């Protein structure tokens, strides 16, 4: 009597196992329920047990593709990600080169295009003297403007002169010419002062 | 009083030339300034003299000169190859006599 009871318990256990395995997947659960009905019909035959053990393997094999699909789906994503990373890695050096090359070229261009500059500041005693010198020197410098750019600025009693050119030889010629003319202007200013003093002296002598 | 000059080259670095023009005692300030101008002329001549020499040396060491030399060598090679071609007919002339 006990033997039939044990047999029923075993079947019930198998059914529960199958149900628990198949519950996550509805189609598999339905298939297993049909199989279990068939098994119930052939329960008396002991040979059907190996077949039953073989059939549960099918759900396992079905589950395996699912498990494979799960890791499969991330792998393409990983590939895409690695591809994107590779693209980013490829782009970054390119962008860096793009940023560096213009900089280098810019530096080279700026270095090549940079003009030579020379400036002189002359401190006169008064703004009037600085103004007189500037007017005289500007007139003399006009013929040289073609080769060398000159800029004269009188700020109060300070005269500032600036040259710009590409050729250092022209620099030397132009600056030497300016300094010679500056000396001449200073002498003229001194003479004007001397003449003024003399005139004042004569005026005083007449008054006396 | 100070007479000053400043040079800025291709590298952008400023170089300054300074001449003091202090009047001593009752000396005329313009006279002192005139003396300063003379001194500045000397400094400018010295400074730009050195600069021009450096510029000339830079041109002499220009790599393009080496390339020009290579071009001359190539021209000589072409002349030599021409000479070799001219020898061809003279070698062939003895054959008709035999």
From Swiss-Prot, chain B:
Which residue stretches does the UniProt record annotate as biased composition, category Acidic residues?
61-79
Supply the alphabetized keyword list: Acetylation, Nucleus
* Disordered: annotated segments: 55-98
Any Gene Ontology biological process: tRNA threonylcarbamoyladenosine modification
N-acetylmethionine PTM sites in chain numbering: 1
Q: Which InterPro entries match?
A: GON7_meta
**Which superkingdom does the taxonomy of this entry point to?**
Eukaryota
A single Pfam family it belongs to is DUF4611
Instruction: Tell whether Endoplasmic reticulum is among the UniProt keywords.
Output: no
> Does the keyword section mention Acetylation?
yes
The cellular location(s) given in this protein's UniProt record come to: Nucleus
Any one GO CC term of the record = nucleoplasm
Under PANTHER family, the record lists: EKC/KEOPS COMPLEX SUBUNIT GON7 (PTHR37363), EKC_KEOPS COMPLEX SUBUNIT GON7 (PTHR37363:SF1)
**Subunit:** Component of the EKC/KEOPS complex composed of at least GON7, TP53RK, TPRKB, OSGEP and LAGE3; the whole complex dimerizes.
Give the protein's biological function.
Component of the EKC/KEOPS complex that is required for the formation of a threonylcarbamoyl group on adenosine at position 37 (t(6)A37) in tRNAs that read codons beginning with adenine. The complex is probably involved in the transfer of the threonylcarbamoyl moiety of threonylcarbamoyl-AMP (TC-AMP) to the N6 group of A37. GON7 plays a supporting role to the catalytic subunit OSGEP in the complex.
Official protein name in the record? EKC/KEOPS complex subunit GON7
User: From which source organism is this entry?
Assistant: Mus musculus (Mouse)
Gene designation per UniProt: Gon7
